[in-house]
């Protein structure tokens, strides 16, 4: 895979994300502007300028009309993608570590950090839309709900919405995950310990019925949303910063590497600065993609399953389009199952 290297940031990447159609790619970093790119050729569509601090998180709504960013400058901003204008700013008491639109596009969750004697919380903001055009007509100024860190849990580090926005799933700094029912006053349904270190990323399957978590403890887990049981575990030999589930193929892509603060003059191979592709079902590593010369901070796979993007500590974004060998790869047991199915169809 020959990557397209996107040079739009001067500082470490914090998040990369595709829109629902997969034609746009959003990137944000520790510098003060976010970028929007065409995912097919890596051409930059534009930048989102207006924050005064590092941008920790970015997300596009289901219509690709708006996107939201959360920043270390204590603000959440909503932007129109037609012209890159900021149309709403919510001020917060602490830095904002994660933002995400709900699947319906009417709510935004934001993780507020646990600093300056604040316990950390997940705030839910509401936006009102014109049902015909999907344009936002009103931004509700105050959060409609605040999930303050529960006793027995550390502050949330990552969070997202399950299918149809039924639950909010959060990963915490103590390695626990938790589930909140949005239809029952955002009550805590259950929580459990899955990692030994802070949960560094949480991404959902295409149908949002299960999700993958990863951590600096070098492990990633796939967890079912309804049962909250760990279905699969992927063990690596380096700390993980990001994990994504691929559509079309039964794979997961993991990324991380030696902590940036510990990197001195080690070679890229020693630092483990590569994306690892694991078989989702068999839990075995099947390939690696090298290229970054610092830890991988964020990985995203296009919803169509045709490309993936990684953002690194060195400020580079690498956009990879999968080749034929990726789609053709199968274990012997998968080939046998396909052959059996083919024979039964012919019969």
Swiss-Prot record:
Q: What is its main location?
A: cytoplasm
An example of a Pfam family matching this protein is EIF3I
Location of the protein in the cell: Cytoplasm
UniProt keywords, alphabetically: Cytoplasm, Initiation factor, Protein biosynthesis, Repeat, WD repeat
Quote a single Gene Ontology cellular component term. eukaryotic 43S preinitiation complex
Residue ranges annotated as coiled coil are: none
Looking up InterPro entries in the UniProt record yields: eIF3i, WD40/YVTN_repeat-like_dom_sf, WD40_repeat_dom_sf, WD40_rpt
GO terms of molecular function? RNA binding; translation initiation factor activity
Under SUPFAM superfamilies, the record lists: WD40 repeat-like
PROSITE patterns reported for this sequence? WD_REPEATS_2, WD_REPEATS_REGION
One record GO biological process: formation of cytoplasmic translation initiation complex
* WD repeat extents: 8-49, 51-89, 149-190, 194-233, 291-330
Biological function = Component of the eukaryotic translation initiation factor 3 (eIF-3) complex, which is involved in protein synthesis of a specialized repertoire of mRNAs and, together with other initiation factors, stimulates binding of mRNA and methionyl-tRNAi to the 40S ribosome. The eIF-3 complex specifically targets and initiates translation of a subset of mRNAs involved in cell proliferation.
- What interactions and quaternary structure are annotated? Component of the eukaryotic translation initiation factor 3 (eIF-3) complex.
Family of this protein:
Belongs to the eIF-3 subunit I family.
**Descriptive protein name:** Eukaryotic translation initiation factor 3 subunit I
């Amino acid at each position: 895979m020959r990557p397209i290297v996107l040079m739009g940031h001067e500082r470490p990447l914090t998040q990369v994300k595709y829109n629902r159609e997969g034609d746009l790619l959003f990137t944000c970093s520790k510098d003060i502007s976010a970028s929007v790119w065409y995912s097919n050729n890596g051409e930059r569509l534009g930048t989102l300028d207006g924050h005064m601090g590092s941008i920790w998180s970015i997300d596009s709504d289901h219509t690709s009309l708006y996107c939201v960013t959360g920043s270390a400058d204590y603000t959440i901003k909503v932007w129109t993608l037609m012209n890159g204008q900021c149309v709403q700013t919510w001020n917060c008491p602490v830095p904002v570590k994660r933002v995400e639109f709900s699947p319906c596009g009417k709510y935004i969750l934001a993780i507020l950090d646990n600093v300056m004697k604040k316990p950390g919380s997940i705030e839910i903001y509401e936006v009102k839309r014109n049902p015909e055009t999907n344009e936002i007509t009103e931004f509700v100024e105050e959060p409609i709900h605040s999930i303050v860190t529960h006793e027995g849990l550390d502050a949330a580090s990552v969070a997202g919405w399950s299918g149809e926005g039924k639950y909010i799933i959060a990963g915490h700094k103590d390695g626990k995950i938790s589930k909140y029912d949005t239809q029952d006053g955002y009550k805590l349904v259950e929580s459990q310990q899955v990692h030994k270190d802070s949960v560094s990323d949480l991404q959902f399957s295409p149908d949002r019925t299960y999700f993958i978590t990863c951590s600096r403890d070098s492990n990633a887990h796939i967890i079912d949303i309804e049962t909250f049981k760990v279905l699969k575990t992927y063990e690596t030999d380096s700390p993980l910063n990001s994990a994504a589930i691929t559509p079309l193929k039964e794979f997961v892509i993991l990324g991380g590497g030696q902590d940036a603060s510990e990197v001195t003059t080690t070679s890229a191979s020693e630092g483990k600065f590569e994306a690892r592709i694991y078989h989702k079902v068999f839990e075995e590593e099947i390939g690696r993609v090298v290229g970054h010369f610092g830890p991988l901070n964020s990985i995203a796979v296009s919803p169509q399953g045709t490309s993936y993007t990684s953002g690194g500590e060195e400020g580079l974004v690498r956009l990879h389009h999968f080749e034929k060998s990726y789609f053709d790869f199968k274990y012997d047991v998968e080939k046998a199952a396909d052959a059996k199915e083919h024979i039964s169809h012919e019969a």
